[in-house]
Amino acid sequence: MMTDSLILTPGTLSLADLRRLAFSAPSVTLAAGVRDTLAQAARSVDRIVADGRPVYGVNTGFGKLARTRIADANLRDLQRNLVLSHAAGIGAPMDDRTVRLILLLKANGLARGHSGVRPEIVDLLLEMGNRGVLPVIPQKGSVGASGDLAPLAHMTAVLIGAGQARVDGRVLPGDQALRAVGLAPVELGPKEGLALLNGTQASTALALVALFDAERVFQAALVTGALTLDAARGTDAPFDPRLHALRGQKGQIECAALYRALMADSAIRASHREDDERVQDPYCLRCQPQVMGACLDSLRHAASVLLIEANAVSDNPIHFAETDEMLSGGNFHAEPVAIAADLMAIAVSEVGAIAERRLALLVDAQMSGLPPFLVRDSGVNSGFMIAQVTAAALASENKTLAHPASIDSLPTSANQEDHVSMATFAARRVGDIVANVRDIVAIEYLAAVQGLDFLAPLQTSRPLAGAAAALRARVPFYDRDRIFTPDIEAARDLIADGVPTLLPGIADVLPRLEV
């Protein structure tokens, strides 16, 4: 049941709005006056059709068939056939969060009034999201130009009573899914099928879901990095604000400040401030602000690109009702999304890479000064030995997944669409990387708290003790070997819930995507 609401003023969604939509399901309604604007635009399209002017996708074929003129009597069939023929995706269906966001983003773009669709189309998109009619959209089949055609065709198929949708956990034919919640299919008018299919909403939604999940994993990795620093009895000297001010990198400065806040009153840190023969810590401890700060800056840049795209008109042709014009362009080309997703992939992979190195340090008795593999009676017990191997496997997998997708292109539609972005895959695989890094950070979380337990009675800082206590409420100390996977899953769930839930006292100082 909906417990909150969002009024959609087209083109004005904020990162906070999008984050909220990614993690919850507010009821969305159009702002006042938007339906009148859409109705005026639809009447303009009718005038263009009546004038008999050839307009791509309105009274012509599509792609390589753009020069084929379509008779007025066939214009509605043209739009329906477009949807059916383009619903050619394959693979597992996208998750509910992504599909709900696709519906909202498509409504947001169409509602700006430059696509020539009737208000009924936008109303139905929003009501499908509000009432939980979520089209079954296969993950694979889009090259990110001309828009996300196949995914959006599967979305649109449900609007016209075809395709399939999930409703209350059941998969139903499109018309039955709509009627199950009191909605009815629509018949598409001129331009409407093309407007629904053309656009970057699928790749943008995939990227946004991955981005907001990455934000939570990033914040958790800051906490686990501080836990590891204390468990390994590292020095806080490299976090001195003077060092970071001299470099001037914004993300680095913010991350260093958070590490200082997390470790401020640690008795462990104070215990080895004097008479410690170690001059410098390994890079995975010492260079955390530099690495994590660069990742933060990269994620923020990606967020700024995706925010623009979430509010964009990425249709083609684009309609200008005030002059009854249709202009063919290339706003459907998802290159901005693809490059932003590639940057996210690199940044999130690096968060996992340095976390895995910190974990490797903890299990190495010579590096950490802790029991081998963080368990008593090592030899009889293997402790964290294979958990670290799992983290290494995930980090190595990410190296391949982080290869840029945007630098690849294959021509389609008989070379009419001869350069494509690969944005949909670029965005989808970021989700895979985020999932891998969440597990790496979860294993580090387990290891760091285990390491801190060995340092008792010395206590870590209050914030870090809170993080350790939250884990220990679900996962007991490793006094002997046991099956590890359930513990990793428990730590992963804590991370997925978000650090503000884990440590409400530091929520205000956590770096976020907003600059």
Curated annotation (Swiss-Prot):
Pfam families documented for this protein: Lyase_aromatic
Q: Where in the cell is it found?
A: Cytoplasm
Q: How is it modified after translation?
A: Contains an active site 4-methylidene-imidazol-5-one (MIO), which is formed autocatalytically by cyclization and dehydration of residues Ala-Ser-Gly.
GO biological processes: L-histidine catabolic process to glutamate and formamide; L-histidine catabolic process to glutamate and formate
Q: Which PROSITE patterns match?
A: PAL_HISTIDASE (PS00488)
| 5-imidazolinone (Ala-Gly) cross-link site | A145-G147
Q: Which NCBIfam families match?
A: hutH, PRK09367.1
Entry protein name: Histidine ammonia-lyase
Gene that produces this protein: hutH
